[in-house]
Amino acid sequence: MEYLLALDQGTSSSRAIVFNRAGQIVASAQQEFPQHFPQPGWVEHDPFDIWNSQLATCRAALEQAKLSAADMAALGITNQRETTMVWERATGKPIFNAIVWQDRRTEAICESLRAEGLEDEVRKRTGLIIDPYFSATKLRWILDHVDGGRERAARGELAFGTIDSWLVWQLTRGRLHVTDVSNASRTMLWNIHTGEWDADLMRALDIHPSLLPEVHPSAHQFGQTDADWLGASLTIGGIAGDQQSALFGQACFKPGMAKNTYGTGCFMLLNTGDKAVQSHNGLISTAACQSGTKRSYALEGSVFVGGAVVQWLRDGLRAIQRSADVEGLAASVPDSGGVVFVPSFTGLGAPYWDPTAQGAIVGLSRGTTIGHIARAALESIAFQSTALLQAMTRDAVSTISELRVDGGASANNLLLQFQADLLGIPVVRPEIIETTALGAAYLAGIATGFYRDEAEVAQQWRASRTFHPVISRDEAAHRIAQWEMAVAQVRLPTTRGH
């Protein structure tokens, strides 16, 4: 058994990847599934679309690899975080669609919690801010809006879970109702200091404890899959939320090690070791993957519009035909010509947290070309990520000596060079950029003895290319100051319509 199977359940598609012992990809399969938008600001998934697409990709990846489930040493799961579902324990039937992490319907519940003065207590206990993003208010909304939901929960008839819990329930035909620390820490119900569900927060949200899954370390022998699904029973050895899994897949095992995922948005995580650092700079504190008995924590910040700015250049401005064309267009000019692009189409995320900020392109002149705007758009991804890393540096107890990167936009050399220039530290792209799935595979491997420990996994990590800063720190500081001035402009109260 020389292989590991990783399930990577994302927001728009499910994937499965077969890895060999060296952490190389042997085969992969992907399947998209429908998104449902019943009302503005609402986003839902059909739980069975998630399960069926995930199972189909597992079978397809094994077939493509010309391997069977019996050849797999273990199975690991990584998943879109916070997305919330509730199902009947007796039948496994969901009582409502999955409410997705992007869904904003619970803002009124969040506002009432803030009005009760719970914000500081929630931050202290969970590391999170009160926001519809996290699972707790989504769970409360389902219980409030499904007939008999709260009564059935009190009788122990219902189960709550994030996506990982739902997949394990299906894979084991309802034998296991579990999650891991990284997913639990995104619910706004898990006390990251005690490592337990928080009874006071459950009372505040009127959530019955019988709903909640058992929580285990991320690397743990959770149980066996039903043999009927894949032709043989597999040990479920790893579970982690997608961003923590990517941190693990990047072998960021020591305090001060950080990774940034450049996707539609950007997610930066910094390992803070066994300390849950309380952020004073607009970041959240979260559980990192736990592969042994010792707890591990991370600081996290997210950028709402990362690679999505390139999609806007393609679909909104029609400046490029394919997203990949942006690098050539941006490289057609030596710099942005003084143009700064602030892509706050949906407000600004960490560390600014300004939902009212609007997008802007500033510094335009008669000599501005589409090349300058494309370059400014790419640079905006690096500027926002720089603001995150600077906030982390202010919060963190250890210095950050390099940034490991992954995600689709990490293929863009111009972006990564500019990122290194702004940060003044090396930016490193690994050989295997499927780090999210790789993290789940590594966790499963450690749990089952396929790998000895984190040290063995760390030896496998290989850099593909390192980008070193080439501009002076004075020049970098000047560019960052220009960015912050542009951000200040989009955060001014709007005078439109007056």
Swiss-Prot record:
Organism this protein belongs to: Ralstonia pickettii (strain 12J)
GO biological process: glycerol catabolic process; glycerol metabolic process; glycerol-3-phosphate metabolic process
Name of the molecule in the record: Glycerol kinase
PANTHER family: GLYCEROL KINASE, SUGAR KINASE
Record-stated family: Belongs to the FGGY kinase family.
Chain positions recorded as ADP binding sites: T11, R15, T264, G307, G408, N412
Regulation of this protein's activity per its record: Inhibited by fructose 1,6-bisphosphate (FBP).
Positions that bind glycerol: R81, E82, Y133, D242, Q243
HAMAP family the record matches: Glycerol_kin
EC class name: transferase
Binding, sn-glycerol 3-phosphate: T11, R81, E82, Y133, D242
Keyword field: ATP-binding, Glycerol metabolism, Kinase, Nucleotide-binding, Transferase
A cellular component term, taken from the record's GO annotations: cytosol
CDD domains: FGGY_EcGK_like (cd07786)
GO MF annotation list: ATP binding; glycerol kinase activity
Record's keyword annotation contains Oxidoreductase: no
InterPro entries attached to this UniProt entry: ATPase_NBD (IPR043129), Carb_kinase_FGGY (IPR000577), Carb_kinase_FGGY_CS (IPR018483), FGGY_C (IPR018485), FGGY_N (IPR018484), Glycerol_kin (IPR005999)
The keyword rRNA-binding belongs to this UniProt entry's keyword annotation: no
Function per UniProt: Key enzyme in the regulation of glycerol uptake and metabolism. Catalyzes the phosphorylation of glycerol to yield sn-glycerol 3-phosphate.
Residues noted as binding ATP in the record, renumbered to the chain: T11, S12, S13, T264, G307, Q311, G408
Catalytic activities: glycerol + ATP = sn-glycerol 3-phosphate + ADP + H(+)
Pathway(s) annotated for this protein in UniProt: Polyol metabolism; glycerol degradation via glycerol kinase pathway; sn-glycerol 3-phosphate from glycerol: step 1/1
E.C. code: 2.7.1.30
SUPFAM superfamilies linked: Actin-like ATPase domain
